[in-house]
Amino acid sequence: MFSSVAHLARANPFNAPHLQLVHDVSGPRSPPGPPRRSRHLAAAAVEGYSCEFGSMKYYALCGFGGVLSCGLTHTAVVPLDLVKCRMQVDPQKYKGIFNGFSITLKEDGVRGLAKGWAPTLIGYSMQGLCKFGFYEVFKALYSNILGEENTYLWRTSLYLAASASAEFFADIALAPMEAAKVRIQTQPGYANTLREAVPKMYKEEGLNAFYKGVAPVWMRQIPYTMMKFACFERTVEALYKFVVPKPRSECTKAEQLVVTFVAGYIAGVFCAIVSHPADSVVSVLNKEKGSTASQVLQRLGFRGVWKGLFARIIMIGTLTALQWFIYDSVKVYFRLPRPPPPEMPESLKKKLGLTE
């Protein structure tokens, strides 16, 4: 299965810009078919890539980039996440960000702000592995199904479909640790560490304790990830087209990473807004026993599900920007192929009468 996916990825339309880098315009046009792959290998050699686009090594390193980008960033903002969760589950006590920090410091001390760091690190590292690794796989797979012209015309829909598919599996890996994290952060005296929380949760509710929140996590994370990837991809495309004063190929690696960070932050703001209501439901659901998502949603009401939005915008905006920056930096460090924003295929230009 994986070998067939790798084969499809090597020939997918997103890879076309790299093939054009080594095209000799003075010579005769190469025939279609097998030579395409050899041209790509030549491009990889010219660029000094460590692996071939679409190879198993490529996907593995993309997954590793996801581990670092999600695991490290989510762990770094645990204090803000803790206060946000407490505002969602007990708005009468925690009335705002600064008030929440003040009460937490007074009751739990500085160490209390780090509650839930272990399940956060483990859970989001596993999620990042699946999210970024599978996104690259599904993007290549779906683009091959659509073909070169349709991939360009429907690229936003492709980004949405690939990211939703990847996040579906990523959340199955995340859900158990997310449930433990919320228990540790929002139920005083329940458990102080992951080692205390997991056995206690299993004893009380069995496996259901770890996966009862997976549907709300899907509700929160799938729209979030769809927005995160699609908005990022199109923002990068727009920045290079309308803002950056020179082509991407002429930008240094550092300049490209700055564009990545800016596009990531813009995407993060939209992500926070789209996913916040479901995030509020998840926080309350994992705190309470026996409640369902619909019951929690009905009880919170419209205003209740938007509690803590400002904190989430700050957190998710910064988080998303850093995640894309780290992920792209990993690609640069390991010398992975980094295709530029997609360009309209020549065949489509001819159909639309855009060629001379």
Swiss-Prot record:
Location within or outside the cell: Mitochondrion inner membrane
Repeat positions for Solcar: 57-141, 154-238, 255-333
GO BP of this protein: mitochondrial phosphate ion transmembrane transport; phosphate ion transmembrane transport
Phosphotyrosine carried by residues: Y190
Modified residues (N6-methyllysine): K106
GO MF: phosphate transmembrane transporter activity; phosphate:proton symporter activity; protein-containing complex binding
Subunit structure comment from the entry: Interacts with PPIF; the interaction is impaired by CsA.
This protein's name: Solute carrier family 25 member 3
Mitochondrial intermembrane topological intervals: 45-57, 136-155, 233-255, 328-356
Record keywords: Acetylation, Membrane, Methylation, Mitochondrion, Mitochondrion inner membrane, Phosphoprotein, Repeat, Symport, Transit peptide, Transmembrane, Transmembrane helix, Transport
Transmembrane found in the keyword field: yes
Membrane topology: Multi-pass membrane protein
Lineage of source species: Eukaryota, Metazoa, Chordata, Craniata, Vertebrata
The family this protein is said to belong to: Belongs to the mitochondrial carrier (TC 2.A.29) family.
PROSITE patterns: SOLCAR (PS50920)
GO-annotated cellular components: mitochondrial inner membrane
Catalytic activity from the UniProt record: phosphate(in) + H(+)(in) = phosphate(out) + H(+)(out)
Mitochondrial matrix membrane side: 81-115, 178-212, 279-308
Membrane-spanning segments: 58-80, 116-135, 156-177, 213-232, 256-278, 309-327
UniProt transit peptide range: 1-44
Pfam families assigned: Mito_carr
PANTHER family, A to Z: SOLUTE CARRIER FAMILY 25 (MITOCHONDRIAL CARRIER PHOSPHATE CARRIER), MEMBER 3, LIKE-RELATED-RELATED, SOLUTE CARRIER FAMILY 25 MEMBER 3
Keyword Transmembrane helix: yes
Residues recorded as bearing N6-acetyllysine in the entry: K93, K203
Gene source species: Rattus norvegicus (Rat)
Function: Inorganic ion transporter that transports phosphate or copper ions across the mitochondrial inner membrane into the matrix compartment. Mediates proton-coupled symport of phosphate ions necessary for mitochondrial oxidative phosphorylation of ADP to ATP. Transports copper ions probably in the form of anionic copper(I) complexes to maintain mitochondrial matrix copper pool and to supply copper for cytochrome C oxidase complex assembly. May also play a role in regulation of the mitochondrial permeability transition pore (mPTP).
